């Protein structure tokens, strides 16, 4: 289930999972329902910091949803992904015959953080 570059098991510092989804407009409510089932499982995982789902403002957007999930470490994310309940939840989303969602997940590390009033060199 893990794609190349999609795992961060060796990373002991905070990571962010960003997953961009293309979902047909008529399937968006069903997609969000499935995603919430998965998010409930992630929320109880050790090392989970938080997540949010963003929806494109424009109906014309190719990437209709963006999920941003923060983890204490890549290792914590990797461990959470091994949970059989989580894997089953993902399979339900992927194998749902009424959903034609395409996901583009990747794990990232912050390299620059900016807050109000910060001056960057």
Please identify what each model-predicted range represents.
Residues 1-15, 52-63, 89-121:
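Glycine-rich beta-strand-turn "strand-cap" elements at beta-sheet edges
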Residues 6, 25, 29, 80:
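Charge-dense, low-complexity intrinsically disordered segments
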Residues 10-16, 26-32, 66-70, 116:
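A broad, low-specificity signal for short, low-complexity segments enriched in glycine/proline
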Residues 15-22, 53-83, 121:
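Short, well-ordered beta-strand segments in beta-rich or mixed alpha/beta enzyme
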Residues 25, 49-52, 78, 101:
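Short alpha-helical segments used as structural interaction elements across diverse proteins
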Residues 27-50, 85, 89-93:
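Short amphipathic alpha-helical segments
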Residues 29, 75-77, 113:
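Residue-level signal for secondary-structure boundary sites
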């Amino acid at each position: 289930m893990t794609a190349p570059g999609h795992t961060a098991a060796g990373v002991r510092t905070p990571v962010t999972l960003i997953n961009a989804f293309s979902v047909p407009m008529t399937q968006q409510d069903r997609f969000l329902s499935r995603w919430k089932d998965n998010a409930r499982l992630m929320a109880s995982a050790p090392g989970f910091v938080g997540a949010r789902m963003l929806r494109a403002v424009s109906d014309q957007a190719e990437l209709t949803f963006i999920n941003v999930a923060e983890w204490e470490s890549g290792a914590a994310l990797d461990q959470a992904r091994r949970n059989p309940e989580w894997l089953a939840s993902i399979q339900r989303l992927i194998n749902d015959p009424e959903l034609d969602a395409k996901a583009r997940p990747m794990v990232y590390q912050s390299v620059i953080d900016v807050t109000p009033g910060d001056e960057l060199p």
